[in-house]
Amino acid sequence: MCLLRLSALGDVTHVVPLVRTLQAAWPPVRLAWVIGKGEHRLLDGLAGVDFIEYDKRSGIAGMRGVRRELGGQRFDALLQMQVAARANLLSAFIPARRRIGYDRSRSKDGHGLFINERIPDRPGIHVLDAIGSFCEPLGLKQDTVRWDLPVPAEAFDWARAQWPDDGRRTMLVSPCSSHVLRNWRPERHAALADHAVDAGWRVVLCGGRTALERETADAILAAMKHPALDLVGKDTLKQLPALLARGELLVTPDSGPMHIANAMGTKVLGLHAASNPARSGPYSDRRYCVDRYDAAARRFRGKSADTLKWGAKIEHEGVMDLVTVEDAVAAFERYRRDHG
């Protein structure tokens, strides 16, 4: 069986419970997974899975390379879990008898031309549950959600070495998503972080190595009254899950780290206005999310969120300004009330 999901970090994290469901039902099954480069680094070592890496920059030549790497094998089933045009075209280079794709409401970019079966059309569900339903045409049901991400012991050792075990509670801040319009203002992050420090918490900034992430972290640090530990750009994708597991609470917009933290059992204070947390928020627990999606729909679309197509993004300039510092502080205090 072959899985096709190239990106992004959060979405491939959502695929892992499906892998666990397939493996639990059919223990001998060997899965091939065509995946993106960075996403492969995150999930490398996932037991029972043979990864075939596809570089999005490689175009048709890279697609031919995937076919060569598959060695001429024809799969009983291809689970085509990405509807973007590039992924649809890539799927044509993967020989398979059953080609299972998304329902019509989630399809786009000619997705239906590359598949011969569809998952059930179930509106109003989380992205993880939609991905989990890819096992249903195979006669299975994803009743249990289990991740167990492949994190090496050295990654946990690295995370433990970043700050002392002194009993101080730790709030992680991962301020950047893959789309700049989902990001919250640095000065608002700083205000929430200062509130946490005033409450006795340690604040740790984390993120990748892009210029935007560095600039955002610097702006947060400059606006804070208190010091914070700056780990932005200092971890690897293998160390990231261990780092997120070490924190007690993660503050982040809709982002890959949100879903990785959730998979590692860390609670998330999600900042939502551009996207619907019921669809793409932290899967296990959304009690500490700020949800201004309906306010965004009314402001920028002139209608309530429940009248929009499920999954509609409201990525407009200024949309995240609907999330106030007071909203985030209230969510933080909600967490403190529930967890002592």
Q: Model segments located where?
A:
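Catalytic machinery of carbohydrate-active enzymes
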Residues: M1-G340
